[in-house]
Amino acid sequence: MLLTHTSSRWRTAAVCALAATASWLPSVQAAEKTQADYFVSSLPGAPEGPLLKMHAGHIEVDAEHNSNLFFWHYENRHIADRQRTVLWLNGGPGCSSMDGAMMEIGPYRVKHGGHLEYNNGSWDEFANMLFIDQPVGTGFSYVNTDSYLTDLDQMAEHMMIFLEKWFKLFPEYENDDLYIAGESYAGQHIPYIARAILNRNKNQNTDPKPWNLKGLLIGNGWISPADQYLAYLPFAYQNGMIQADSDSAKRVEQQQSICIQKLQDGGHDKVDTSECEQIMVAILEETKDRKADRMNQCLNMYDIRLRDDSSCGMNWPPDLTDVTPYLRRPDVIKALHINSDKKTGWSECNGAVSGHFRAKNSVPTVKFLPELLTEVPILLFSGDKDFICNHVGTEAMIENMSWNGGKGWEVSPGVWAPKQDWTFEGEPAGTYQEVRNLTYVVFYNSSHMVPFDYPKRTRDMLDRFMNVDISAIGGDPADSRIDGEKGPLTSVGDHPNSTKAEEDKAQQLKEAEWKAYYRSGEVVLVILIIVACLWGAFLWRTRRSTSLYKGVDGDEGRESLLTGMGLDNFRRGARRHDVEAADFDERELDDLDDAPKKPANGYSNVNSEKERQPHNDSTFSLGADSDDEAEGSERGRRKEHS
């Protein structure tokens, strides 16, 4: 009895345990997010028509410190020969990639009043776009306030965790050709991430499949700090900001001498050297016009054609006055699935992130850029009116760097890669240079954020770099020429109704039309055979009936039989059935073929927006900076390399 009672107890306990487990499992499963949890079903202010396919939200990269990275993904509008994904990062460190999404290369631009317009030049034409706010704490990303990152290897590790989880959520993109692009301080982020991906690909003992990293694009990049620091004064001379041998020049040269000494004392191996950063600060001080009104006293460090208040460009670009309130709207926050753990509103740049991210244990990416060039093509591009990460510094870095068996622009001993003129739609656009897996593009009359000024030109650059050829798709390619020669036919958007999908639809319609004709003929033939058989049977029965009843009812018997068998009704029914069997008649096919076709991507007015023109000075007279978290010198640093 005791054993039986004990056994019964254990059975009861086991049943209870199983029941508890069963009730617990669904809650665990519910915690696992799926694609559907990230799907953006509506976006406030979006243009009329079908919404672009997009996903957005947070992915946890470190549970211990509540570290979550925010992403916003747009599916490509068209596919050329294969699938491609471009991962975009802005700089800072600590500046949101929503700058890229909403002011540069994303499909929408925010207008006054919070409505969105299509960006004629967005990069989602032939590539899926993945914008990520990183490091943690940047933009919509968040982390415990005592857990901000400090070094570039930490950032790369977080990005690898993010990508592993993201590709698990969206496996259909894992085999895409992958490109990583960005600007400014992303010149540090991108090579570190690329190196981590390449190392992962080589370690196939633990990782399931390699990621197809195909190229890197870096605009006005902070790659070689030493070359950039020593380029500030030459750039100022070239652009007439400071006159050589003037008192101003002598004061700046004195600060440059201090910088050179610091570089010789180990600064070449550092990402930031504060004594060298003071060179740019000194030039901005020397070029201030203290007699001008308050909003025009200082040069804009991001676009020297413009002037600003004493923040010297921190209020730029002007679209911030519309982007910031839009991204802080409750309905937008809800649409983008922003977690409730994100306690503060969106800000362009986070001073706390920048203040912690000093990269003291990191080497500048120029140190291993040559190694990357042996495995991955790299494109560097520069707006020629940017001061903070100017083209003079980038060109000095290239000339001083050795990779793939040569130094700088040397193709062979004594032979250098030519600088080729680039024209776009009949206007001088810049120059191209290519050598040993490196491409360098200079954009004329452009700022620190080149896509902000010339989205269509930058997408032409992207499509060339990705070797996109739209000859199999249709559409009207851009008139883009390097040294007078047209390259591959690449799209710049003005063909939403001329894609391969539309052509396939037209071909399918023609095939359906012929099938309908053929099917109609078959149906008619079958019906005629049936009618003939019935008619034969009818005649046989009629003759038989007539012979039996003739002389009794005269001809009335035949008439009554015709009516009684309902042959007239059968003919009418057969005619209706014929039309239904073929689904539609020729007139309906003609109407279908002549009906106007709507683009599958929902772009109704994508081509109406003209390319942005250079802004005048008054355009940039804005209010306070978007970041409320930093002041003084820290405020200057946090967006120093945005």
UniProtKB/Swiss-Prot annotation:
It catalyses: Preferential release of a C-terminal arginine or lysine residue. Residues 476-500, 586-642 are annotated as: Disordered. One of its GO terms (biological process) is apoptotic process. It comes from the Eukaryota. It is an enzyme of class 3 (hydrolase). Its main location: Golgi. Its EC number is 3.4.16.6. It holds the Pfam family Peptidase_S10. Residues 632-642 have a biased composition (Basic and acidic residues). Glycans are attached at N120, N400, N437, N445, N497. Residues 1-30 form the signal peptide. Belongs to the peptidase S10 family. Protease with a carboxypeptidase B-like function involved in the C-terminal processing of the lysine and arginine residues from protein precursors. Promotes cell fusion and is involved in the programmed cell death. This is Pheromone-processing carboxypeptidase KEX1.
